[in-house]
């Protein structure tokens, strides 16, 4: 695999003109797809504020600030000195607490997807104006529940070995997962099972909205049967053994993705991968028949850019991904021998002369198969089944009815994905984001080894959109309203009708 990578950053002072978004959607129900409990698809920071002797400080002012966007939310502690910030986007935060007669204390915390971070703040008696700062990272051990959870951030995702950059492949890092290769109703292939449950028992969410395949209820894929969008993901969590009501729906794993968003600094990346015939050995079976290496060409690329529209207020992020490939399919083809064709035509001339033109056309297709000269007599009994004699000719292992050819044929497949996200801090109590995703591709659904006239393709467009508004009520209540929609189509047709 050949790979090029470039990452670029620009200073925050390059913020562009302010764009006013005249859209505020309040929605109770999801449009088109179910939503899942935000406790599993967001983060949480909670803790207590205490004085030097460990007594709770009620009504202390606690301010949470996002380190990337400087968005802040203020609440007050309850009668036991406890506070909680829920429905948070994973990221870096600072929590500061203040109260009359005490020094200000600040706790820097990293909130990961699906986690509840404890950030206790101890306030000292104010002898002079000063502040105390405490740092903490993500918890190593989950103490809130018995769920088995694996969290992977964007940096870890970027270095994870992942041919094809399949978004769903990050779940393979979790305990209890087994690649499903049994096929059947859910294809096998890139899907997986957790603790013996079927591969269609898993729930996939994107920013809290359902992202399962609408027909097979497995991971949602495009024309290449890969889940594009890995470059758009900020963090992923995989929850197993999650039988509490917040996960709902299915008993398998809950695989949750959170998308990237713009910040106060411009940031982005560009990467390119290539794989081709020069990097791959010949297939064993083709080599045995003296066939050359088949043409292979795979090009994959991603690029993204995010930043401020108005510093501390409005942000954008766009991601574009694409893959174009030609990969041969290895197939075994049984071809009639010339002796068998002659015997069939001779017999038809005697019993059904009107059928001769049809069979001549049929045999003509077989005789035009690429690589037919390499076909070998490897079928049991010469491939004759119960045919022993026809039109005076005896058939069997020494005079076969059919020869077998190991062939590799191909046609191009392509897929691309474009994502746009807009975030806005609407005062201290409201935060809004709108995300739109479009994917489109052309799949080589069937490649015929005999004649390309029988090739089939499938056009597979998809649209997803989501609007999310988070509102804080007073000092101790928060609500998140989400509307999402998913539209998918798979149109199958013959390449050469």
Give, region by region, the residue ranges found by the protein language model.
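Periplasm-facing N-terminal accessory domains of Gram-negative outer-membrane beta-barrel systems
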Residues: 2-4, 8, 14-153
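A generic structural motif
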Residues: 50, 65-67, 98, 195, ...
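Short coil/turn motifs at secondary-structure junctions
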Residues: 52, 67-69, 100-102, 275, ...
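Acidic, glycine-rich flexible loop segments
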Residues: 128-130, 139-191, 196-203, 208-245, ...
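Short, flexible loop/turn segments at beta-strand junctions in immunoglobulin-like
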Residues: 85-87, 307, 471
């Amino acid at each position: 695999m050949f790979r090029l990578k470039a990452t670029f950053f620009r200073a925050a002072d390059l913020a562009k003109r302010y764009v006013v978004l005249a859209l505020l959607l309040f929605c109770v129900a999801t449009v088109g797809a179910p939503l899942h409990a935000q406790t599993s698809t967001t983060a949480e920071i909670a803790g207590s504020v205490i004085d030097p002797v460990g007594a709770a400080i009620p009504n202390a002012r606690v301010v949470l600030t996002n380190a990337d966007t400087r968005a802040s939310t203020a609440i007050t502690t309850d009668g036991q000195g406890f506070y909680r910030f829920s429905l948070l986007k994973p990221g870096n935060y600072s929590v500061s607490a203040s109260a009359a007669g005490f020094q200000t204390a600040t706790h820097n915390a990293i909130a990961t997807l699906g986690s509840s971070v404890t950030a206790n703040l101890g306030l000292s008696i104010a002898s002079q104006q000063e502040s105390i700062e405490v740092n903490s990272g993500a918890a190593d051990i989950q103490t809130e529940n018995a769920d088995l959870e694996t969290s992977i951030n964007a940096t870890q995702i970027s270095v994870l070995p992942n041919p094809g950059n399949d978004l769903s492949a990050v779940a393979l890092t979790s305990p209890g997962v087994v690649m499903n290769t049994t096929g059947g109703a859910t294809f096998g292939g890139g899907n997986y099972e957790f603790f013996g449950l079927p591969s269609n028992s898993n729930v996939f969410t994107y920013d809290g909205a359902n992202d399962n395949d609408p027909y097979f209820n497995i991971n949602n894929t495009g024309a290449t049967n890969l889940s594009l969008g890995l470059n758009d993901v900020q963090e992923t969590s995989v929850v197993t053994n999650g039988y509490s009501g917040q996960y709902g729906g299915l008993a398998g794993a809950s695989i949750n993705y959170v998308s990237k968003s713009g910040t106060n600094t411009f940031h982005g990346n560009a990467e390119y991968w290539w794989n081709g015939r020069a990097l791959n050995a010949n297939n064993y079976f083709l080599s045995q028949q003296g066939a050359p290496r088949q043409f292979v060409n795979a090009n994959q690329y991603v690029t993204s850019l995010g930043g401020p529209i108005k510093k501390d207020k409005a942000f954008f992020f766009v991601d574009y991904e694409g893959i174009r490939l030609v990969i041969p399919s290895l197939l075994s083809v049984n071809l009639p021998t010339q002796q068998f064709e002659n015997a069939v035509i001779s017999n038809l001339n005697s019993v059904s002369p009107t059928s001769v033109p049809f069979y001549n056309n049929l045999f003509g297709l077989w005789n035009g198969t690429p690589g037919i000269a390499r076909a070998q007599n490897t079928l049991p009994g010469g491939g004759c089944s119960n045919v022993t004699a026809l039109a005076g000719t005896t058939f069997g292992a020494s005079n076969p009815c059919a020869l077998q050819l190991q062939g590799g044929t191909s046609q191009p497949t392509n897929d691309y994905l474009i994502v746009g996200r807009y975030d806005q801090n609407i005062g201290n109590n409201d935060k809004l984001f709108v995300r739109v995703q479009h994917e489109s591709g052309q799949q080589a659904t069937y490649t015929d080894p005999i004649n390309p006239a029988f090739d089939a393709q499938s056009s597979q467009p998809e649209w997803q959109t989501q609007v999310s508004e988070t509102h804080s009520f007073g000092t101790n209540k928060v609500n998140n309203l989400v509307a999402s929609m998913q539209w998918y189509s798979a149109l199958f047709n013959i390449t050469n009708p």
